Amino acid sequence: MPRRQPPRPLLLLSALLCAPASAFNLDEEKLTVYSGPPGSYFGYSVDFYIPDPSTVSVLVGAPRANTTQPDIVEGGAVYHCGWPAARCRQIPFDNTNNRKIKVNGTREPIEFKTNQWFGATVKAHKEKVVACAPLYHWRTLKDSPEKDPVGTCYVAIQNFSAYAEYSPCRNSNADPEGQGFCQAGFSLDFYKNGDLIVGGPGSFYWQGQVITASIADIITNYSFKDILRKLAHEKQTGVAPPTYDDNYMGYSVAAGEFTGDSEEELVAGVPRGAQNFGYVSIINSSDLTFIQNFTGEQMASYFGYTVAVSDVNNDGLDDILVGAPLFMEREFESKPKEVGQVYLYLQESAFLFRDPQILTGTEVFGRFGSAITHLGDLNQDGYNDIAVGAPFAGEDRRGKVLIYNGYSNGLKTDPSQVLNGAWASQSMPSGFGFTLRGDSDVDKNDYPDLIVGAFGAGKAVVYRARPVVTVNALLILNPMIVNPDNKTCQPPGSPLFVACFTVRVCAAFEGQSISDEIVLKGELQLDSLKQKGAVKRTLFFDYHQSHHYFSIVMERQKKLYCQDFLVYLRDETEFRDKLSPININLNYSLDESHFKDSLLVKPILNYYQRPSVTEQAYILVDCGEDNLCIPDLHLSAVPDKDQLIIGEENCVMLIINPRNDGEGAYEAELHIKIPPEADYTGVERNNKALRVLSCDYKMENETRMVVCDLGNPMVAGANFSTGIRFSVQHFENSDFSINFELQIKSSNKINSTSNLVNLHINITAAAQVQVRGVSHPPQIILPLHNWEPKDEPTKEEEIGPLVEHIYELHNIGPSAINNTVLHVGWPVSSGEEFLLYILHIQTHGPLHCQTSSPINIMQINFAIPQDTPELAAFLYNSTISHYIRRREVAVAEPYRRNSAKILNCTNVKCILISCNVGQLERGKSAALKIRSRLWAETFLQRKNDPYTLSSNVSFKVKNMPYKVQPAKLPEGSIAIRTSVIWSTPNVSFVIPLWVIILAIMLGLLVLAVLTLALWKCGFFDRARPPQDDMADREQLTNNKTTDA
């Protein structure tokens, strides 16, 4: 059969598939770190070497290390590292060059040790050590340069004084069809009796195989020159049908007992079997027949990448652990995440296992499950524990190791400790946790330790287990029920006596390999359930504080050590809470400063035992012999009004009646949940029938509350009424009612609350809407002075007198209105003759109008007016002055007939003006002004016939801007009238001119005669008194004298 192209070696796949808890009792401070040559992959494999009970050291594989072998490059090595920390030295398993044969007269190598990855696996069993080179190549055909990775192993015994090579797949007929790509030593383990198990996953077109052999057979009669060697008791699994090609059986191996015959079986991982789902086989060690398989749950998860055996639940039966580091977790519809899994199969009896317990990794690409090791009983609790490697998890992919503790039902699902890699590598991840080995005690403290390899960083780390201390602590309170009236203790420096009680702290310890004396650091917290800043009801007698730190020295195991502390109760006026228990809490920890030895690891408290103890004291209350108050709380409430109208200043008072028909209710409070529409305004204080409570506004979980104190306690038989006032204004999103929730709450344990009262107050909307209007002028008097009709008028004055109708829609309230329709019917013509010719429509406020037909169809020129005084006056409720111009000669009263003919939309043609009115709040208006001209010619043709022109306006409110609507929405209508009447002029007489002249002349003659008669009678002469005559004469005489 022709050879297929050899795949990339499987060893590289195992190493590079993913290229790019809190602490418990593995000590992360006192580490032993071994380092190897850079780039050697030191730490790729590790194990403990215990040739005798008194000697423990560490073996570390470095598969890319250089050795002293001539002409061999990076052949790989195994290092022996002493403990305590000592320098590591290479173990000289093989110091030779490649063996050669003569081909056509030339000596050519028959084996190839360069890059053979010696040290990729290493295992020790007592004084025996086996290390393998799975990429060791062998030249099968002497006349062909081709070579095959058959793999080889070396055995060291007698403290590395004797060595033997073991290459079970090296033969003269090696090829892919056979064992040419075997890679023997890819995995490695020992039976308990010391026999060797070797995995060769590349045999038979990568079907894989497992091989077992006795170390004694390998050593006996070994000769370096004996290249092709067959052992008498060697066992190998054979070739399977072609459907098993590329399965990789032997990728991992382990040994355990599963058939109940006390004879161990071997376990082999087959990560690409079962159509790439992977499986693990239990194989009979006697004849290597297959007994049972466990199959993976997900394709390509690499189920079987690693296997381990441990009695996790300590039932005497071995259990199987399987790693699937490429398992991908799918969460809902999110992208799958590669997190890895570990499966635990608990053995219940021979051939019978439970369904697997599954541990799932948490970090993407962390490769959780790449390594699994049995740790032994790490914390000495009677159950074995395991470690799981996630070599590419953590910060910068430095790697993690997770410790899982066993218990009676398997493994605890959360790790008790997570070890983090401390090294980062620029070229590749450090691989911390890629290989693990446990279940050996290097420091002889009776606790097993752990080795972790970090081949990318060239490190191997030994973690030592810390002794576990289990503390049994308790608190004793005397008395547990404190009588606040029994004041027998006087604190230092205080003249007052207080009630007090004793807190006794007792503790004992035990543990494996613990010193005779340990010291606990303790902290006592009084009333620990009270939040920070709250009043602590009890204080230490000597310190007046609610917490105290102290130490307990315990000199030997299992002996109880106690300390007493005196505690007192504050005065009752200093706190409200009398019912809830007084929590006394003890926290403790180990005083590590007490341990002086720098080499020994310090003990640690048991992770699975809470380092705290709690007890509770109670305050004696007046609640009978059982000190348990059981109230019987009742609550009723009514509002002082049944209905709230939107838009009004709604103030509502809740009249509330709390009642207690049982025993005292402590810290009793009335809780009122306020609806969004309401605001708390206060307590009613002016009604003597209502008790005045102390109330506060609060926010509880974003809920607005009013909380009122009802007493501490609210005594038995309490029954009263109180009034709480609210202002209700915010109705934007209100439904048909608002709801207040009321309840009494207390701190009593039983019957702590009253019935819940839901108080509903109905909400309604109501608005009074008024439409009003005016005509300006109210009447037109014909005929018009100095006006002549024109056949084709172009200016508005040529049509006739101005007529304006003004309409206002006014919301009196209290609620707002929205979406109102306003209609105006306007008498525009009768037959072919115009009546009122519309020039312009003007609006004010949230009003949008349109007409049923065009206006000003004759394109009459007009000036667009601003708000006229009469419109402004109308809108602001002022008196509208009508200035009616009368004809100068028309001074008589208008001529009226008994009745005027009414012209409206019932008998003439009208234009319909439709308006949509927006939201009008209380007291707001919208107005419409129609500016028109009376078509005078139409009426002058009907001389002396009076008319009344009537426009009709109506409105209807469609809805209000609230969720709640009134039963009937406002609507109404009115008519605005303009009268057209005729004047009747007074009769006038013409006087001739000569009559006027004659009348003037006669008048002047009469005036002259009258004047002459009066003069003749002395009417114009002035009579003087005698004294005045004398004075005048004296004055005259004096003047004359002076002149002289």
UniProtKB/Swiss-Prot annotation:
Disulfide topology: C81-C88, C132-C153, C169-C182, C489-C500, C506-C562, C623-C629, C695-C708, C849-C905, C910-C915
Signal peptide: 1-23
Record field: transmembrane: 992-1015
FG-GAP repeat segments: 28-90, 104-165, 170-222, 236-288, 289-354, 355-413, 417-480
Membrane topology: Single-pass type I membrane protein
General function of this protein: Integrin alpha-8/beta-1 functions in the genesis of kidney and probably of other organs by regulating the recruitment of mesenchymal cells into epithelial structures. It recognizes the sequence R-G-D in a wide array of ligands including TNC, FN1, SPP1, TGFB1, TGFB3 and VTN. NPNT is probably its functional ligand in kidney genesis. Neuronal receptor for TNC it mediates cell-cell interactions and regulates neurite outgrowth of sensory and motor neurons.
Family, per entry: Belongs to the integrin alpha chain family.
UniProt-recorded name of the protein: Integrin alpha-8
Lineage: Eukaryota, Metazoa, Chordata, Craniata, Vertebrata
